[in-house]
A protein has these predicted regions:
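ADP-ribose/NAD+-binding catalytic cleft of ART/PARP-like enzymes
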Residues: 1-25, 152-153
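Surface-exposed loop/turn and secondary-structure junction residues enriched for glycine/proline
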Residues: 14, 19, 28, 65, ...
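Extended catalytic/binding region for NAD+/ADP-ribose chemistry, centered on the ART fold
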Residues: 20-45
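Conserved NAD+-utilizing ADP-ribose enzyme module
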Residues: 24, 44-154
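A broad, structure-centric signal for solvent-exposed, well-ordered loop/edge residues
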Residues: 11-13, 38, 63
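Short, conserved beta-strand segments within well-ordered enzyme catalytic domains
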Residues: 3-5, 30-31, 53-55
């Protein structure tokens, strides 16, 4: 299966880096099935970035959590990760809480909106996907195929 990643530099050998803030599925290396989404990730750096392609081969011995859709379990998992609580999964896959959804997640986590209000606000205009790798063993499922520079067409 082909996965994409967008960044500001070539990432031939992915790593799990601790960022300044917790992401949807906690610290990890994030990819997507969607080419256009990876392009948006790459272009967030001043309109120029690197688009990567990886070959992903699943390993049945790894602990994987997959959310097919935005569900109550997905919301609770993201809130827990965004609050800085680690999990025991090698790989987590599911929808993204994009920038707008992130604000709703944060408002829900802070008790500013109800669960029902979150779901009313959280309707996506386009589908999203992310798969995050959280252990060295999980990164072994990825093989770098290529990375190339792209520019914003605007």
């Amino acid at each position: 299966m082909k996965l994409y990643h967008g960044s500001k530099q070539i990432v031939e050998f992915p790593e799990i880096r601790q960022a300044r803030y917790h992401k949807d599925f906690y610290y990890g290396f994030y990819c997507t099935l969607f080419l256009e989404q990876a392009k948006r990730w790459a272009l967030r750096y001043n309109g120029v970035g690197i688009l990567h392609e990886y070959r992903y081969t699943p390993d049945e011995t790894l602990k994987v959590l997959k959310f097919e859709d935005m569900t109550e379990g997905w919301l609770d998992f993201i809130v827990n990760c965004r609050l800085g609580n680690p999990h025991g999964y090698d790989i987590v896959e599911g929808p993204m809480a994009n920038d707008t959804i992130f604000n709703y997640v944060q408002n829900f986590a802070d008790g500013k909106i109800s669960r029902a209000a979150f779901w009313e606000l959280a309707r996506f205009k386009r589908p999203t996907h992310q798969i995050s790798f959280h252990t060295a063993r999980s990164l072994g499922c990825l093989v770098f195929e290529r990375g190339y520079e792209i520019e914003d067409e605007i």
